[in-house]
C-alpha cells in the first residue's frame, strides 16, 4: 500500500497525564485503502490515541496529520474521523443498522449510499440482517 497516499500520519506522538505517559512515541502511517485495527491490553493507550485522532485530546508531543493536514487546530466536528465507543451500541435505543448509519447520516450522505455502505459493513463483519 506504500504507493497509495498516506491518509493518516502519526509522528512521535506522546500523551502525558502528569508524569504518566499514556501514549509514548507512537509512529504510524495508514495508507488509502488500508483496513486498520488497534489492539492491545487494557491501559496501553488505545483509547487515548483514538481520542487524539478524534480531537477530544491533544498530543503532549508529536503530530497527527489527516490527509496531510495537521489536526491540532481542527475541531472534532470537522475531522473525517469516527469513533466507536466501548459499548455494543452508540445509541442502545436504535437498531444495529441505525447505529452504523449514524455517522453517515450526520455527514448528510445520500440515503441510497448510506444503505449500501451500511449493508456492506454489516456483511463484512457477518452482522447482515440486523
Task: Identify the residue ranges that each predicted region occupies.
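Short coil-to-helix segment of the ABC ATPase nucleotide-binding domain corresponding to the Q-loop/switch region
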Residues: 94-101
Amino acid at each position: 500500500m506504500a504507493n497509495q497516499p498516506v491518509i493518516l500520519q502519526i509522528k512521535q506522538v506522546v500523551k502525558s497525564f502528569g508524569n504518566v505517559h499514556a501514549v509514548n512515541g507512537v509512529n504510524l502511517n495508514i495508507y488509502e485503502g488500508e483496513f486498520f485495527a488497534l489492539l492491545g491490553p487494557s491501559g496501553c493507550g488505545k483509547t487515548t490515541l483514538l481520542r487524539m485522532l478524534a480531537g477530544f485530546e491533544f498530543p503532549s508531543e508529536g503530530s497527527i496529520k489527516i490527509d496531510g493536514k495537521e489536526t491540532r487546530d481542527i475541531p472534532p466536528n470537522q475531522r473525517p474521523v469516527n469513533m466507536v465507543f466501548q459499548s455494543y451500541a452508540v445509541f442502545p435505543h436504535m437498531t444495529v443498522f441505525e447505529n452504523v448509519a449514524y455517522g453517515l447520516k450526520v455527514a448528510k450522505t445520500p440515503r441510497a449510499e448510506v444503505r449500501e455502505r451500511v449493508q456492506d459493513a454489516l456483511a463484512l463483519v457477518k452482522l447482515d440482517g440486523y
